[in-house]
Regions:
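Short, charged, low-complexity amphipathic alpha-helix
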Residues: 173-176, 205-273, 326, 348
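N-terminal, Lys/Arg- and Ser/Thr-rich interaction peptides
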Residues: 7-67
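Nucleic-acid nuclease catalytic cores
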Residues: 73-74, 89-113, 117-225, 229
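A short, surface-exposed helix-loop junction/capping segment
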Residues: 57-72, 244-249, 261
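Nuclease catalytic cores
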Residues: 72-80, 84
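Short, hydrophobic/amphipathic alpha-helical patches that form generic packing surfaces
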Residues: 36-42, 55-59, 180, 184, ...
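Extended, charge-rich alpha-helical segments
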Residues: 121, 132, 270-348
Length: 348
């Protein structure tokens, strides 16, 4: 069976699944099975903290049920309209919801855009000038990018009376592949990202088309779809993927490649321990200096006082299972559950 036949059979099966969907979120998740979307790309490229190419493959090959992210979908969809409205007020642009778009020549590459950006209303003859991706984030944590620390959501755009005067593309790196994918599919030259952080702060960014990255995305996406999805061949697994596999006990004899990797890992672990020891010494010295304070500030280059660090007690509510077992032993037994844990890698 050639790839075209496999695609047609696949599409027919997805259509049968759609007929069984009971709500909007299930329908949305099932429609995503028709191809690769922007939110899949970071994982396929190996640049996602949360998912791997193997995770995406399991979903696209029907090994994992769709509709497991309903709460995230419902919450994100509800806030999307709020973020989009504030974007309009800040920028002066007009945004409209958009239908999905299949890339010319690659119908399995599908852009499900949050919004398309117009220079004015459609009634006034407005034209599409860009796209908009709406995001929400609980907090703006620190990350390492190219060896340097920065906020996950960096300095954002600056607007003066709805005019963009300073551009920034310092978005969460997880989403760079997504917006580049959308520009590749649509042919648009820029995509704005609007994010609501902690339900209290809105930031806006502009990302321009990167042809080199888009070519990498295209190559990876086509290969993943044809070689892995349609031919039903799993992509290379990460260690996290391998841990989740349930395998019967069996033994392999180490070859040169395995021995080389194990020895390389040992060398890295030694270096890691040395760094951790050095880090502990620095933290102990720092603790001695700030032990009597809960917050430390500094003055930046602009003369503004900023928070450098906080050192506060955190409250955590947890379930006391031991006390519950002592007071309600029979009820405790009723709720015991035995599960198989992920595989644990140990070295000897």
């Amino acid at each position: 069976m050639d790839l075209q036949d496999k695609q047609e059979r696949r599409n027919a099966y997805i259509q049968s699944l759609l007929e069984k969907c009971k709500n909007e979120s299930d329908t949305f998740a099932t429609l995503r099975l028709y191809g690769i979307g922007g939110s899949d790309m970071a994982a396929i490229l190996g640049r996602s903290k949360w998912h791997t190419a193997y995770d995406i493959w399991k979903v696209k090959t029907f090994r994992q049920p769709v509709g497991e992210e309903k709460l995230c979908f419902d919450t994100g969809h509800a806030l999307e309209e709020v973020v989009a409205k504030w974007y309009e007020k800040t920028t002066g642009y007009v945004v409209y919801e958009a239908d999905h778009l299949q890339m010319q020549g690659y119908p399995f590459l599908i852009g499900n855009f949050d919004r398309l950006v117009y220079d004015k209303t459609i009634e006034d003859g407005g034209k599409i000038i860009g796209g908009l991706e709406c995001k929400t984030a609980n907090e703006n944590t620190k990350i390492i990018v190219n060896g340097e620390e920065r906020s996950k959501w960096g300095k954002d755009n600056v607007y003066d009376n709805k005019k963009l005067v300073v551009e920034s593309d310092l978005i969460d790196p997880e989403y760079m592949a997504q917006v580049q994918f959308y520009m590749m599919v649509s042919g648009l030259e820029w995509w704005d990202v609007a994010v609501m952080i902690g339900n209290r702060e809105l930031r806006y960014y502009r990302v321009h088309a990167d042809r080199e990255l888009q070519q990498e995305i295209l190559n990876k996406a086509v290969s993943f779809w044809n070689d892995n999805v349609l031919n039903d061949v799993a992509p290379a697994l990460t260690m996290n993927d391998a841990r989740s596999l349930q395998i019967e006990d069996n033994t392999a004899t180490a070859d040169e490649s395995i021995m080389s990797l194990v020895n390389k890992r040992k060398d890295i672990v030694v270096k890691q321990k040395a760094i951790e020891e050095e880090l502990k010494l620095v933290e102990d010295e720092l603790a001695e200096k700030i032990k009597d304070y809960t917050k430390v500030t500094y003055t930046n280059d602009e003369g503004k006082v900023k928070t450098l660090l906080t050192f506060k007690s955190m409250n955590r509510t947890s379930f006391d299972s031991k006390s519950f077992e002592a007071k309600h032993p029979e009820l405790y037994k009723d709720f015991l559950k035995t599960t198989t844990s992920s595989r644990v890698l140990r070295f000897y």
